[in-house]
């Protein structure tokens, strides 16, 4: 049976030491260090203190602030801790970022993607007519080839849950609670936590919830907001 590596034993926890060695060798005037919000509380806060100490020890002043990608024109609610460092006595400081909310919705970034059958994939966009947001951000270009557009295999039971999840959101911006499903659609034994395990992407909003690295475990968390596409997947 596959056993996951405990977070405390993950070798990536010490990558900041390698980062500090690069800083010490190349001595850039400034650097940016990004990490997830959880770094502040990892190991009771000890890891966060060690990271800051390592960066300061190689000759840098540092400052850290929480930043959110949605405040920089990105259609995703993604909070991160951003450390900016500069050489001591350089007179530099943490930048004052101009924040901009995108004049677009998440649907604008999904509009040119073709519908897929369960387990299917496509390497072609559905149309050459794409949104101004895709054009202005450079996400979509005339010569672009569509990549990584594939759908997970879905059971009929999951598709029915998707339909209910989408209707709840589109009709009243409400989230589906797993315990509100009829018994014939419930397969998970855990009925006390992760009750929002089925979640639709907020297509009509200026940003959606955070995309996760472990999407294989949370694949029901990013349901396409178009109800017609949900029906097509049958």
Residue ranges of model-derived segments:
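Bulky hydrophobic/aromatic "packing anchor" residues in well-ordered structure
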Residues: 67, 110, 211-212
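Short, surface-exposed beta-edge/turn micro-motifs
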Residues: 5, 79-80, 206-209
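A structural signal for well-ordered alpha-helical segments within the folded catalytic domains
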Residues: 17, 45-49, 104, 108, ...
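Flexible, glycine-/basic-rich loop-and-beta segments that form/coincide
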Residues: 73-128
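C-terminal target-recognition/interaction regions appended to catalytic cores
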Residues: 135-234
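Short catalytic/ligand-binding loop motif for oxyanion handling, primarily in non-cytosolic enzymes
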Residues: 1, 39-42, 73-76, 91-93, ...
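Short glycine-enriched, charge-decorated loop/helix-capping segments at active-site entrances
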Residues: 2-10, 227-228
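Conserved Class I SAM-dependent methyltransferase catalytic core
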Residues: 11-86
